[in-house]
Amino acid sequence: MKLHELQPAPGSRKERTRVGRGIGSGKGKTSGRGQKGQNARSGGGVRLGFEGGQTPLFRRLPKRGFTNINRKEYAIVNLDKLNRFEDGTEVTPELLLETGVISKLKSGVKILGKGQIEKKLTVKAHKFSASAKEAIEAAGGKTEVI
């Protein structure tokens, strides 16, 4: 067998149906669109969420809540991600961004307590969870809120 002799498995490739090419094809005349109506027209079809004139679901349900324009979203870093740094390293948001631990700074960095930390690090972040702070200090490191 050579590369130019390769063929797809039988039945794995299907030829596309050419519609509107005579009644003998089985998809002629109306081309599978049925008779008249909105869906038979060019560009026809109903918009997303349209339920045939019945009040759509999104209008039957009540409005709820609002978007807080002052919301702060923190980039989240779990403890186990900090093990990649050497002992005694000062871990800053800039360093986390540089090393690819976080992709965006957002409103700051929050350290969460998932996983174990074995290194003695000085961690500077905008927020710490109680369990993260406890674990870093138990490993001999320091935490600093910036």
UniProtKB/Swiss-Prot annotation:
GO CC, alphabetical: cytosolic large ribosomal subunit
GO biological process, one term: translation
Domain of life from the UniProt record: Bacteria
Kinase in keyword set: no
Organism field: Geobacillus sp. (strain WCH70)
Name of the protein in question: Large ribosomal subunit protein uL15
Protein role: Binds to the 23S rRNA.
The family this protein is said to belong to: Belongs to the universal ribosomal protein uL15 family.
A Pfam match: Ribosomal_L27A
Subunit structure comment from the entry: Part of the 50S ribosomal subunit.
Alphabetized UniProt keyword annotations: Ribonucleoprotein, Ribosomal protein, RNA-binding, rRNA-binding
One example GO MF annotation: rRNA binding
Renumbered residue ranges of the record's region Disordered: 1-53
Biased composition regions of type Gly residues, renumbered to the chain: 21-35, 42-52
